[in-house]
């Protein structure tokens, strides 16, 4: 009878336990977790609705004949391809349905039908209990001892160990970066780490005046004045900068490159520059504007507070008379609406970030099995590795896919 220890009771750890026990009912599986209950971080996924995957999770590109996963990042973007190919969104849906969890789509995003993360956490935990998985909770594991063919954790010997500790993000929900040191002790190396899928901090002179406002915008991130990322969606203005789904999507790059970046918001994405000019020109030429100031020039076409900030951002005084502005002034104001630029100063940190970008380098792990090339029987899955996905369900898909690969190898023993 093989014995496997799984360090970390998150989505990847719970899934790995179920895969192992389903394929080999006689196997002994123990999950160690530093929290008093498993799945705490999973409960917060997708604002508590649990965005499980995305129809684009298995979209692959090719670079010099080498396949890579388009929505995943890391030093080797090809590493995730095999796991995602073997266990993609369809396999995930089938797996969840086998546990009694039906799923549904919202646009390209996959959710449990209940739209409640607790559904997934509770069912995964209950299935583990039903299969005889042992839970050892409130246990902080810092060291994995090993002999020639065994691993020793808390005085107990195991044949295999799966490190599923996650990254550094949201320590209050369980991830504290401990997995990096465990794997480094066996000779593995860790990349530089960054908070990702988080809010972007910007110069605050103008955004503070818009605190609490939301607007659909096309968001472009520039590195040294060259565009590197773009996403459309609802942006939330905050006193520190910007939040919202499109901001989360591009935050990885802002985290890595910091104040070398600027962000540009197209606040009227459904209109061309010429269309916006015509709209503003029409307001300026309207007789009712004869006695108005620039304070209200944009009020007919966009939120009043946003309009006033754009006027000031473009260098005009709100007290200036509308009747005195020229076509050149209007073009400048329209440029502000189509490209509201803010200097990036950083991102919100690990306590808020949903994901850690970077991790244990994948070059010393087998991409088919997730097993270490340095220590047979040692596995790493999920976010602890240098694989992180875009916002939108990609990271949970990777958690399940990598768990499947590791569990399959453990139960077949082909590479042990």
Predicted feature residues:
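Beta1/beta-strand and adjacent pyrophosphate-binding region of the FAD-binding site
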Residues: 1-12
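A conserved FAD-binding loop/helix module that cradles the flavin
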Residues: 169-186, 387-415
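A conserved short coil-to-beta-strand element within the FAD-binding core of flavoproteins
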Residues: 137-150
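A glycine-rich dinucleotide-binding beta-alpha-beta segment and adjacent secondary-structure elements
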Residues: 137, 308-388
